[in-house]
């Protein structure tokens, strides 16, 4: 098991797929990293040398915000919006959709399970 950015990445998968197990690295960034370091996309993690794994680790640490730092940054951005009491911050605070989606029906993912209203029959 190779450990990159505090995450154990699977050894039997291709490098591009394995890097996406790190929060903050999707397929596009994984391909960018592999291209920059000259690693073939079809190679598997178990076939990489320790030096190549170290190169990947250093490239991610130097250029990308990942894992805990990224989660903290996103949480701080949301907290800043809530402290400003702007429209987006109020929507976050109330647990409603932030980007203009309708809420009369739908929005169940954001609002949670439907709460029954006493006395209301169909």
Swiss-Prot record:
Part of the 30S ribosomal subunit. Forms a loose heterodimer with protein S19. Forms two bridges to the 50S subunit in the 70S ribosome. Pfam families: Ribosomal_S13. One of its GO terms (molecular function) is structural constituent of ribosome. SUPFAM superfamilies: S13-like H2TH domain. Belongs to the universal ribosomal protein uS13 family. Residues 95-122 are annotated as: Disordered. HAMAP family: Ribosomal_uS13. One of its GO terms (biological process) is translation. Keywords: Ribonucleoprotein, Ribosomal protein, RNA-binding, rRNA-binding, tRNA-binding. This is Small ribosomal subunit protein uS13. PANTHER family: 30S RIBOSOMAL PROTEIN S13/40S RIBOSOMAL PROTEIN S18, SMALL RIBOSOMAL SUBUNIT PROTEIN US13M. GO terms for cellular component: cytosol; small ribosomal subunit. The keyword tRNA-binding applies. The gene is rpsM. Located at the top of the head of the 30S subunit, it contacts several helices of the 16S rRNA. In the 70S ribosome it contacts the 23S rRNA (bridge B1a) and protein L5 of the 50S subunit (bridge B1b), connecting the 2 subunits; these bridges are implicated in subunit movement. Contacts the tRNAs in the A and P-sites.
């Amino acid at each position: 098991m190779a450990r990159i950015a505090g995450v154990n990445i699977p050894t039997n998968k291709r490098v591009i797929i394995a890097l996406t197990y790190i929060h903050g690295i999707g397929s596009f960034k994984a391909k960018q990293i592999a291209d920059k370091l000259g690693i073939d996309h079809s190679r598997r993690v178990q076939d990489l040398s320790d030096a190549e794994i170290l190169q990947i680790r250093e490239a991610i640490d130097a250029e990308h915000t990942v894992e805990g730092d990224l989660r903290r940054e996103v949480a701080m951005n949301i907290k800043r919006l809530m402290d400003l009491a702007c429209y987006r911050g109020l929507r976050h605070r109330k647990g409603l959709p932030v980007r203009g989606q309708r809420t009369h029906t739908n929005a169940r993912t954001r609002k949670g399970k439907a709460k029954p209203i006493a006395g209301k029959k169909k």
